[in-house]
Design a protein with these regions (language model features):
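C-terminal motif of bacterial Sec signal peptides marking the signal peptidase cleavage site
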Residues: 8-11
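Extracytoplasmic "Venus flytrap"
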Residues: 24-45, 49, 58-66, 94, ...
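Periplasmic-binding protein-like
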Residues: 26, 82-94, 116, 213-224, ...
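An alpha-beta-alpha
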Residues: 46, 137-184, 282-303
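Flexible loop/hinge segments that line or gate small-molecule binding clefts
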Residues: 108-130, 245-252
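Hydrophobic alpha-helical segments within soluble ligand-binding/sensing domains
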Residues: 128-152, 258-277
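Flexible loop/turn connectors
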Residues: 239, 245, 249-293
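Hinge/cleft segment of the Venus flytrap/periplasmic-binding protein
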Residues: 271-327
Length: 327
């Protein structure tokens, strides 16, 4: 297990309050750092928040998720110094959801627990998730290059069928693709295991190779496994859609990405707690929040694609209907 501490110096002109006596301790997803996506965005948000608010940041990268509970218990049982203003503990990633219901909460009012990202609402724990259905829907609709009846299909590579956020991405992309006139959208799961499929980039790459030329677009919602799809796109000149962040640098044939601005959400949530703002224990951020969007890669413009303004104008309503139907 890797652990490290960051004491980051903020610029002299910063206007935010000084929280130099505050501490934020984070346990990241096992093997997640370096995915150039979701986990790296969270890490970037934590580092930016540490600079902005001038707190001490302690980061743990466990080899297995079970180590996360031991790290938490060490934090829970460690007494705070009298001059410590706040101490936040962050579970970063839905892999730790199984801990929520039976978690012992701190008695010290200066301590708070957070979890990124989960749909569970638990009293005493600050949780949130950033949706991706609307942004994926727009990416799917944009991927239809010709709706004049020509046969064209898309392929979605997904981690597993159990992750609700993966399901949002899969459903959104497929629904948008079909709504805009695509002829079909197949889905392939890398794993049937509850937490499987996120670190299988070789398998993702091989499956795409076996289906080279069978699809107009390749979209992946599989954590670090996405890099296998990006490699396939780069080497075989197939169109692909990025996930979690702007992935246009991975391949010139990735001309759009579904972006979840986890860094923005992390910065704002930690800032609110350090400033003792009253916020809900559970928050849901959808397309209206600005934390999810579909972006075009550098030098790619909207006029390359079919006009989907009739879909864009209704995307908030479309996402609301989906969320209500899947509660």
């Amino acid at each position: 297990m890797l652990s490290f501490f960051l004491v980051l110096l903020a610029g002299c002109g910063k206007e935010e309050a000084d929280f130099s006596q505050a501490r934020v301790e984070v346990v990241l997803s096992p093997g997640g750092v370096g995915d150039q996506g979701y986990n790296d965005q969270i890490l970037r948000g934590l580092q930016t928040a540490a600079v902005r608010y001038d707190f001490t940041l302690a980061i743990h990268i466990p080899e297995e998720k079970e180590q996360g509970i031991q790290i938490y218990n060490d934090w829970l049982n460690a007494p705070l110094d009298n001059d410590c203003e706040r101490s936040l503990f962050v579970f970063s990633g839905s892999e730790y959801e199984y801990l929520l219901q039976g978690l012992t909460l701190p008695k010290d009012a200066r301590k708070d627990v957070l979890m990124f990202e989960t749909e569970q609402a638990v009293d005493g724990i600050y949780t949130f998730f950033v949706g991706c259905y609307a942004a994926s829907y727009l990416a799917g609709a944009t991927s239809v290059l010709d709706n004049n009846g020509e046969e064209q299909k898309a392929l979605v590579i997904a981690a597993n069928p159990h992750d609700k956020q993966v399901k949002r991405a899969v459903d959104g992309y497929r629904d948008g693709y079909l709504a805009a006139g695509g002829n079909g959208c197949d889905v392939h799961y890398l794993s049937e295991e509850l937490d499987g499929g996120y670190r299988m980039q070789d398998e993702a790459y091989q499956f795409c190779i076996e289906n080279d030329g069978n699809y107009m677009y390749y979209f992946s919602a599989a954590g670090a496994s996405n890099k296998g799809v990006y490699r396939f796109s780069r080497e075989t000149y197939n169109f692909a859609v990025g996930m979690d962040d702007d992935m246009g640098l991975f391949s010139s044939f990735i001309n759009m990405s579904v972006v979840k601005h986890m860094d923005w959400a992390v910065i704002n949530l930690i800032g609110d707690l350090l400033n003792n703002k009253k916020i809900p224990y559970h928050q849901v951020f959808t397309y209206e929040s600005g934390y999810e969007e579909m972006v075009f890669s550098k030098e790619v413009t909207e006029d390359w694609f079919l006009d989907i303004s009739h879909i864009k104008n209704r995307i908030v309503e479309i996402e609301q209907r989906y969320e209500e139907a899947n509660q």
